C-alpha cells in the first residue's frame, strides 16, 4: 500500500488531504538528522525551511546536510541561490509548495525541515505576501543606516512601528527587516496586518525537538568550534575573493559576518568566535518566540526520543490516520 493515497490542490475537496510532516526546533537541535533517519525508512523527500541554507557556496556555517546525504535522499531548496542573488519570501513559498506537490506525485512524504519561523509560517499558514513594489531609494537609506549604526537600530525602529512583525522576523536578517519597514512606509499600515492567511490543503503533523536551553547552548558552542576546524575561515575567504561583499544579506548569517570582520582585521579570531556563540544564543531565544512548548499543535520530543524507533512508529501512525489529532 502506498504511503500517500490522496490528492492536493483544487481536486482535494472530496479526498483525504495529502500528508505533510514538519520537523522544527532551535538551531543545533538535530532536525536534519531526524529527517534523514526517517527518510531512510519511510519513502520521503526533505524540503529546506532554513533561510540560510538556500545559498550555494555557503555550507559550513549554515550546517547543511552533507553531499552524500543529499545524494542518498531527495533534498529540495538547498544551495540553489547565489550569495548575491535577491530572493523573496513569496518566491520561497511558491517553490516550497511546488516541492511538496512534486513529492506527493512521487508517492513520497514531504518533510519540511527548518528553524526559520517566517518560512514555516508562510507555507503552513498560506500567507498572501503583500504585493508592494520595492522602493530602492528607501531601501538604500535603511541599508546604509544599518551598515553605519548597526542592524539593531533599524530593528528597534520596526519594534516601535509593528511589534507583532518584529516577533516574527529574525533581527539579524537585515533584508527582511528593511522589507517590513518598506511595506509599512508605502502602505501606511502594519506589515503584520497585511499578511492574509489561506492555509494550503495539506494534513500537517508537526514534530518539534526540544533541548533544554543551557544544554543547547553548550551544543552550539561546540558546533562553532567544529565549524572552524572544518574550514569556515577558508570558506569565507573564498566568498570574499569571488567578489561577494561582506555587506550582502547572505553574508549577514552567523559565522560569515564575524569571520569576514576577522579577515578584514577589525576583530580578532577570538572575538569572532565569541560573537558567533553570542549571536547563536540570541538566535535560539528568538526562535523560541516561534516554537513554544505550550503550542499544542506541535508534538514535542526530546533529543533522545528523536533518535529512537518510537519516532518512526509515530510518523507511521500519522500516515495511517486521516486526522493528525489522533496522534499523541
From Swiss-Prot:
Origin, by domain of life? Bacteria
- Please list the residues that bind substrate: 27-32
Report the coiled-coil segments: none
Signal peptide as annotated in the record: none
Which PANTHER family would you find in this protein's record? TRNA DIMETHYLALLYLTRANSFERASE
* Known function: Catalyzes the transfer of a dimethylallyl group onto the adenine at position 37 in tRNAs that read codons beginning with uridine, leading to the formation of N6-(dimethylallyl)adenosine (i(6)A).
Q: How does it assemble?
A: Monomer.
List the protein's name.
Answer: tRNA dimethylallyltransferase
List the source organism. Dehalococcoides mccartyi (strain CBDB1)
Amino acid at each position: 500500500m502506498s504511503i500517500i493515497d490522496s490528492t492536493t490542490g483544487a481536486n482535494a475537496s472530496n479526498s483525504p488531504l495529502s500528508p505533510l510532516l514538519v520537523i522544527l526546533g532551535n538551531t543545533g537541535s538535530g532536525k536534519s538528522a531526524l529527517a534523514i533517519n526517517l527518510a531512510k525508512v519511510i519513502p520521503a523527500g526533505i524540503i529546506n525551511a532554513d533561510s540560510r541554507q538556500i545559498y550555494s557556496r555557503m555550507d559550513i556555517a549554515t550546517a547543511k546536510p552533507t553531499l552524500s546525504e543529499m545524494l542518498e535522499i531527495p533534498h529540495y531548496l538547498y544551495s540553489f541561490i547565489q550569495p548575491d542573488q535577491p530572493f523573496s519570501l513569496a518566491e520561497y513559498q511558491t517553490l516550497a509548495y511546488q516541492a511538496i506537490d512534486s513529492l506527493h506525485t512521487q508517492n513520497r512524504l514531504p518533510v519540511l525541515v527548518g528553524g526559520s519561523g517566517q518560512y514555516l509560517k508562510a507555507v503552513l499558514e498560506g500567507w498572501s505576501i503583500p504585493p508592494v513594489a520595492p522602493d530602492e531609494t528607501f531601501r538604500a537609506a535603511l541599508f546604509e543606516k544599518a551598515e553605519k549604526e548597526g542592524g539593531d537600530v533599524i530593528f528597534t525602529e520596526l519594534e516601535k512601528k509593528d511589534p507583532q512583525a518584529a516577533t516574527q522576523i529574525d533581527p539579524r536578517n537585515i533584508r527582511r527587516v528593511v522589507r517590513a519597514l518598506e511595506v509599512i512606509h508605502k502602505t501606511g499600515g502594519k506589515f503584520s496586518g497585511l499578511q492574509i492567511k489561506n492555509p494550503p490543503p495539506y494534513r500537517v503533523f508537526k514534530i518539534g525537538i526540544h533541548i533544554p536551553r543551557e544544554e543547547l547552548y553548550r551544543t552550539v558552542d561546540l558546533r562553532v568550534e567544529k565549524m572552524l576546524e572544518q574550514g569556515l575561515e577558508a570558506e569565507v575567504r573564498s566568498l570574499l575573493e569571488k567578489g561577494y561583499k561582506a555587506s550582502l544579506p547572505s553574508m549577514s548569517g552567523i559565522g560569515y559576518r564575524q569571520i569576514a570582520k576577522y579577515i578584514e582585521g577589525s576583530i580578532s579570531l577570538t572575538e569572532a568566535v565569541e560573537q558567533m556563540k553570542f549571536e547563536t544564543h540570541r538566535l535560539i531565544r528568538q526562535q523560541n518566540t516561534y516554537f513554544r512548548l505550550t503550542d499544542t499543535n506541535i508534538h514535542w520530543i526530546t533529543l533522545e526520543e528523536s533518535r529512537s524507533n518510537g519516532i518512526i512508529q509515530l510518523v507511521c501512525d500519522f500516515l495511517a490516520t486521516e486526522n493528525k489529532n489522533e496522534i499523541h
